[in-house]
Amino acid sequence: MKKTLAALTVVATSFVITTPAAQAHIATPTWSAANSVSTGDQDAPAIATNRNGYVAVVWEDDRDTDNATDNVHSEIYLRTFRNGTALYEVKLSAGGSSGVTNWRHLHPDVGLDDKGNAVVVWQDDPDGNGYYNIPYRVVNTAGTVTASGSANTSSDGQQINPRVAVDPDGAPAGGAVAFSVVWEDIQTGTPATVKAAGYTGPTTRAWEVTASTTTGQHHNPDVAVSASGDAVVVWDDDGDANASYEIGLIRLGRTNGAATLSRRVANSNTGGQQTRPSVAANFNGDFAVAWESDHTGTAGSWTRSFTSTGVARFADVQVAAGGKAPSIGIDDESQTVVGWTVQATDLDVWVRGFGTDGTDAGRLSSQQLNSVPGGRQEQMTVAVSPYAQVAVAYTDDNDGNTYDQIYLGQDFSNNSW
């Protein structure tokens, strides 16, 4: 959009919801723009939060104004808040190599530890050759980059779609920033696989492994890390190469990347296509997954929750018919919130909360959650603190000029009390 909200601060009463049922739990967020500069096009937000009031948002920022659909010259920006107040905003990417005019930095993700340190990953092509690698940056609470590197050890082929998750209490507990990164690895003549790397310190890569099988196609990974440092990885899995995808799942150990939960399927309904998973884990290692599925004949978003030992609490639960690109967060009581995008007159963004029984009783009711009702809103992403505080971010084009910016909603709870 051509940013009418360059200095946006919207009161909670401006949000949009569907008509609630009796006793519904309706969110009342505090809204703001995550990006401080509204020139050009901001897309692909990701969000993280922690137990101490920090919220971090990253996005692609293309300040060209010639074509909103062209992501050439996109940079990666990070902005961090604490208790609703912005602490800093910083550009983490560095444009292109000398003489290169078609560079790109895309698909960012962010994680936070409990001290407020952020880890950001993205796919970068600074030399404009169409091949990507996965850089990372560690950023402290003052917005200073304290460590950097490349998550992938080999630059051969194509590395895309990275995600990151941060050990909440460091390694060892109370120690250095520790994190895990996953990405999709595509090598010439071989099927796409999912790679994972674990860091026990800001620059200490402890391991790199192939999380998926090496047969069939594997895409769109996500990762979540508990206080143990173990990483739960999910992805689109077609290990038997029959062109039907399920949600692959494995947990990898902090010290060496060995499986601490064997490779398996997260979804219980196996018909149709199961794709685009999102995963979240809490301090104790319980985790939950959301994904797209069309096994009923109609596409929608679904979810399932697991104990730290990998035992499912319930079979697949439908979040929303027609829901696309779900994002999930979890608190320390293993209650979850799922956000998604749905086709309406344009596109709208929604959220819904769940308890450990797979219902939304006492949790956020299914509701449209937009700051401004008009135009197109999409790419909803959700983060939940250990105390059930929720933060969301999404892209907004309420004036319909095709240029987006990033809206941030904070200060609401998944609990109804």
Protein language model features and the residues they cover:
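Secretory targeting and sorting signals
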Residues: 1-24
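Extracellular, repeat-based ectodomains that mediate carbohydrate processing or recognition
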Residues: 24-417
